[in-house]
């Protein structure tokens, strides 16, 4: 069956339209164990966010966060560590993201191969629409502010971190890649290095053929919980609309769709969506983004996001911002764990500051 542009943009990674996203994503290949790798420790936290309090979807302000502490953390009590924040994709939470990238095994393997030890932090942004797109919205809550503000402050207060931008990294895959590009561009002063893994939604996504019948189906929903029965692509439409075109005057969904009930595009809503595309707002933050110590992008050659990823790389270079791009053999999810162990963590190991 044909893979649609929507599926690629939302970062499903599904090879068949309608296939379960989580099912597709756990097919990530497993790297072999690295001989002699010391054990890391994983802590599961609940971090309260004032930025997410009071959102109209009722998404809990207590957010699941996983922290991977390096092998030496308990032993070297005076040592401080850089921190890398890793953002998950659409339809999954941080727990499934951990499984996809095979943490803590891939971190242990990277450290055993010579990557300097660091702390990894994986927050969850999953909600009733399967993802908040790491944006600020009265409907979803202010996830951008939470990730770039409250979460950093919490981790720096509770762990032995090197609490400065030069020792802080941001990475994400798919929707998380969108989040990393969005936050990494808009809040560049908070981070020292940025890595985008097959980032979705770098270009304006448009209405993508949303029909009058589909709009009628969505507008007939009587609760946000009813969205759980929707097909994948329609649920993804609600996720985007709740993040990018929230409307507190339109219960129960509290959003505006980019197409009206007659099937016509709504230019004022599409303009809001386009304004949230990193390729649309990059130019406004060039002076901040230029200060990164390093920026890298990667994507599989069989991934529908190849061209969008390439466009972001080219846009950075056009502004005189150094970045690297690797298009590797693979699809949207096939090599995530290998990439994390052998490329992503070594990238941060060589680009972040490890000195006090």
Regions found by a protein language model. Name each.
Residues 1-10:
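Bacterial N-terminal signal peptides that target proteins for export
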Residues 2-3, 20-22:
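N-terminal targeting/docking segments
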Residues 10-18:
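Bacterial N-terminal signal peptides
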Residues 23-356:
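Non-catalytic cap/lid and distal C-terminal segments of serine-dependent acyl enzymes
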């Amino acid at each position: 069956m044909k893979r649609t542009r929507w599926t690629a943009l939302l970062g499903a990674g599904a090879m068949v339209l309608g296939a379960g996203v989580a099912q597709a994503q756990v097919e990530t290949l497993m790297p072999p164990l690295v001989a002699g790798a010391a054990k890391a420790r994983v802590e599961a936290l609940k971090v309260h966010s004032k930025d997410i309090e009071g959102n109209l979807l009722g998404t809990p302000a207590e957010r699941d966060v996983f922290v991977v502490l390096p092998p030496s953390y308990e032993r070297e009590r005076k040592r401080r560590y850089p921190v890398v924040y890793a953002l998950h994709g659409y339809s999954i939470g941080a727990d499934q993201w951990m499984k996809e990238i095979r943490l803590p095994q891939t971190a242990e393997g990277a450290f055993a191969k010579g990557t300097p030890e660091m702390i990894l932090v994986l927050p969850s942004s999953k909600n009733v629409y399967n993802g908040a797109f790491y944006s600020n919205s009265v409907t979803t809550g202010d996830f951008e502010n939470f990730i770039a503000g409250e979460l950093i402050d919490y981790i720096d207060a509770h762990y032995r971190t090197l609490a400065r931008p030069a020792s802080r990294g941001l990475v994400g895959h798919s929707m998380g890649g969108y989040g990393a590009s969005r936050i990494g561009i808009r809040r560049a002063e908070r981070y020292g290095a940025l890595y985008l893994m097959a980032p979705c939604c770098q270009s304006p996504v448009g209405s993508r053929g949303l029909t009058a019948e589909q709009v009628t189906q969505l507008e007939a929903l009587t609760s946000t919980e009813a969205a759980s029965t929707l097909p994948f692509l329609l649920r993804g439409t609600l996720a985007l609309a709740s993040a990018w075109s929230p409307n507190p005057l339109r219960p129960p969904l509290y959003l505006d769709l980019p197409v009206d009930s007659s099937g016509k595009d709504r230019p004022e809503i599409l303009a809001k969506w386009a304004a949230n595309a990193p390729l649309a707002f990059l130019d406004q933050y060039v002076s901040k983004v230029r200060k990164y110590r390093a920026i890298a992008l990667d994507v599989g050659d069989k991934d529908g996001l190849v061209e969008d990823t390439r466009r972001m790389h080219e846009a950075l270079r056009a502004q005189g911002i150094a970045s690297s791009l690797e298009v590797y053999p693979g699809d949207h999810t096939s090599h995530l764990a290998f990439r994390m162990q052998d490329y992503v963590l070594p990238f941060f190991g060589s680009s972040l500051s490890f000195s006090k």
